[in-house]
Amino acid sequence: FKGNKVQLAKNYSAPGFTTEKLKAPQLPDQAAIRKDKGASWFENRVAQPSAKTHKEYNAAPGTDLSEIIRSAEPGGIIVLVEGTYPIQSAMFIDKPLTIRAANAANKPLVRFNGEKSDNMVTIADGGELIIENIAFDGVLEPGKALAKAGISTATDMIQPYTLTVDGCEFQNFGEGGFFAIKGTKATFAKSVTIKNCFFRDLSGDAINYAAEKDDIGRYNADDMLIENCSFYRLLGLPINIYRGGSDESTAGPYITIRHCNFADCCNKERGSVMRLIGPQVLTVENCNFDNSGRVGATIRLDEATWEKVRIANCNLWNSGRMVTTTSQAIQGKMYNIRPAYINADAYNYTPVPGSELEKLSIGLKKNSLPQ
């Protein structure tokens, strides 16, 4: 037993070994090893992230928006001038894109006039969408199909996505199966941000991330922010978020809802303005409920004792009660103040400056939509 080499600490020796400093082994490149392995019919490729160009694409009324989106490069910005944009099929988002109005004060109007029911916008694998100051209108054209949703997801996604909706309007959708913004079953958003938006005259839900009903800890969006949004005359639920089961391997969703206004929403029996099932971390604050959830609830919260939930500084005027599972969710004082709005006839539900709600920082913030 001889001719062996070993690297030992000083003052140590081993019979049969020669002590010397050894070189670290040179391991082969793992990519080089793997590139020729696997089934012969499988093309072994590693997807490279696409560079974001931020190139602008201008669209005019009557333009085929689906075609512009198809041809746009990842990171592209599609700019719509004022006018009406009829679409016959969903705008398919499978890359990072921004769709925005050229002028926030004059929102472009998107209408669905396809022969077959579809979403107005569908987010698919690879999709990251920012959409700003666009109005989605559900007025039905004779002989045309109804839209299924304003913004929704493909049914066969395997990748997470992100969505930001800022300054948009969703209006005049009279079918109960319509959802303004919806996450479908087996889809997952890393983040969803909905702010400065206006939802009115909807028969279905405004914001629905409640498709996972198997009660095994799954949910449709991880990090959700709903801020400074106005809801008026909704038959469905303004906000519906569901995470069922008690699987401790899933830690979300994390939900923040603040400075929102609900007027004449979900006044059906056993209805809820907000239906929040199983959020792990939840903050609802500075919201105003006006003639909403009258024969049901303003907030229906199903939470466990260990979940971090907080409902604070809200106003309930002629509205339903808050229903919670534990006694820890409602913190601080709730108010019963008749709201005074800047111009409710023009759908501006911002509190009048100097009013009680404005002083308490309850309801919509300044410069809320619509103007």
Regions found by a protein language model. Name each.
Residues 1-77, 355-356, 360-371:
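Extracellular "leader-to-stem" segments immediately downstream of a signal peptide or signal-anchor
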Residues 2-5, 127-138, 159-172, 188-204, ...:
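Right-handed parallel beta-helix
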Residues 60-67, 74-98, 102-117:
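N-terminal extracellular ligand-recognition/capping segment immediately after the signal peptide
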Residues 111-122, 142-156, 174-186, 201-221, ...:
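Extracellular beta-strand/beta-solenoid scaffold signature
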Residues 331-371:
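C-terminal accessory segments
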